[in-house]
Amino acid sequence: MGTNLTNMDGKSKFQDMSIAPQHTAEHLLNATMVKMFGCPRSRNAHVEKKKSKCDYLLDAEPTAEQVAEIEAKINEVIGQNLDVTIEFMSREEAGRIVDLSKLPEDASETLRIVRIGDYDACACIGAHVGNTSEIGTFKVISHSYENGVWRLRWKVVL
């Protein structure tokens, strides 16, 4: 039995504008993790208004200094007031720009690519803010490391 990703009106949870700031922040977190640690984007994410979490495959637990750097870098990028834009392109063209390894096999031949300035680009069906200035402040709540998986719990303070 699969996960139900729709709400009562049949819309995807990812298209819920009330979590757009958090969803865009998740993209910034993923891009920051890839840049800092060379790891893949989160293997598992749960994005909500009050708090969110993402899991990353890492060889070692990030230090307290690295965790502080992650938070600072994301807030620095938020403060750059970057435009968040959406483009539609062929799967072949998108494959030259973004990692499509997590894309379902039955995904459309035309993909929706979300760009956050020149900081991140990702295939995504979800709702996003129009500019990083709409996100608020990214705050790390807690983190844990077990069996090569680092879980980061975080929130956005509007």
PLM regions and their residue ranges:
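Active-/binding-site microenvironments in catalytic and ligand-binding cores
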Residues: 1-158
